[in-house]
Amino acid sequence: YRLTYYTPDNQVSETDILAAFRMTPQPGVPAEECGAAVAAESSTGTWTTVWTDGLTQLDRDKGRCYDLEPVPGESNQYIAYVAYPIDLFEEGSVTNLLTSIVGNVFGFKALRALRLEDLRIPPAYSKTFWGPPHGIQVERDRLNKYGRPLLGCTIKPKLGLSAKNYGRAVYECLRGGLDFTKDDENVNSQSFMRWRDRFLFCAEAIYKAQTETGEVKGHYLNATAGTCEEMYKRASFAAQIGVPIIMHDYLTGGFTANTSLAMYCRDNGLLLHIHRAMHAVIDRQRNHGIHFRVLAKTLRMSGGDHLHSGTVVGKLEGEREVTLGFVDLMRDAYVEKDRSRGIYFTQDWCGMGGTMPVASGGIHVWHMPALTEIFGDDACLQFGGGTLGHPWGNAPGAAANRVASEACVQARNEGRDLSREGGDVIREACKWSPEL
């Protein structure tokens, strides 16, 4: 492979799709051979020379390993940089992009382990994608909420509630001060709560809470289903009853289904919340799999207005600088290369709308100062047990979160250092809020 696919003197084109792989060769296999094999097996190569190679423009179409970089502190690990010509990929298809780059090469026996760390999506390719159905600014305009993080809550217990009791829990949280409530990722249409009943009771809760508070409210109605046709039916019903947002589990549902649903949401005025259920199966191993920053980039291309991104401070794993790196890749129009945050390539999204990060998992009011400092305003902070676990009930739990959030935002705007004074800010707010 290395005679054809390892090209250290290669000049990368501005239209090439670039990939950074963390590569662990098998003992005795040269790194150059492994890097070339990755480039070959994820583009035009196969295990032997075939006569039909002569019928193609192989030098133009092949992937090329153009650089190898030893991983500091590891004896047999390398970052292999691979450039793929843009013509290898179908326009507007995340499915085809991932099928080509990661679909086959991970089983290559010359490799002990392989992890896709990052992708550079050139403007020439990113412009073939619609991106998020609406984006952060349009969502803020629809909600008429600015200058603070949005607040949400996942309804618990996740399974077992009747539709009416579920709707009651939604109402209590929304009237208490939250902006959103959420279906858990595995709430679809089970025997104890069919989807249509849940949608109707949640819509009633939303409208009642909006009337009482004067604020726009929403509930992430999970439209994920066993078939795309059923998913469209649920999304269509949500649009008919006038709710603002629905939800999809994009990894278990699939990228093709997600892109189709995002297009439906764009055409029908629905925001789309994305849950990353199953992500840790793919991204948790440090030496093998796909890093979440790649899954976040591909989701932004496929389409999603919200995406769960980890918390840094809660119960789920996430390193602060690395998490902030892919949060920027979700929200910002242009992100510079920064290896300290795990960003291997400069990424220019060329005006594609941003996806709002959602921090969820084991967080509560004492985390509010850190979350406000880390994520800023353009984020949704989801407190499940941190709302429903309040000793006075759901509405007081929601009120406590809202008071804590607004106190932290005000303190930040006054120039106070939340990393040092966050505890004092919460204690001061407690004097004026018995719920907190």
UniProtKB/Swiss-Prot annotation:
Its EC number is 4.1.1.39. Its main location: plastid. It catalyses: 2 (2R)-3-phosphoglycerate + 2 H(+) = D-ribulose 1,5-bisphosphate + CO2 + H2O; D-ribulose 1,5-bisphosphate + O2 = 2-phosphoglycolate + (2R)-3-phosphoglycerate + 2 H(+). Its cofactor is Mg(2+). GO terms for cellular component: chloroplast. The keyword Lyase applies. GO terms for molecular function: magnesium ion binding; monooxygenase activity; ribulose-bisphosphate carboxylase activity. The keyword Lyase applies. The basic functional RuBisCO is composed of a large chain homodimer in a 'head-to-tail' conformation. In form I RuBisCO this homodimer is arranged in a barrel-like tetramer with the small subunits forming a tetrameric 'cap' on each end of the 'barrel'. PANTHER family: RIBULOSE BISPHOSPHATE CARBOXYLASE (PTHR42704), RIBULOSE BISPHOSPHATE CARBOXYLASE LARGE CHAIN (PTHR42704:SF17). RuBisCO catalyzes two reactions: the carboxylation of D-ribulose 1,5-bisphosphate, the primary event in carbon dioxide fixation, as well as the oxidative fragmentation of the pentose substrate in the photorespiration process. Both reactions occur simultaneously and in competition at the same active site. HAMAP family: RuBisCO_L_type1 (MF_01338). This is Ribulose bisphosphate carboxylase large chain. It comes from Euglena geniculata. The lineage of its organism: Eukaryota, Discoba, Euglenozoa, Euglenida, Spirocuta.
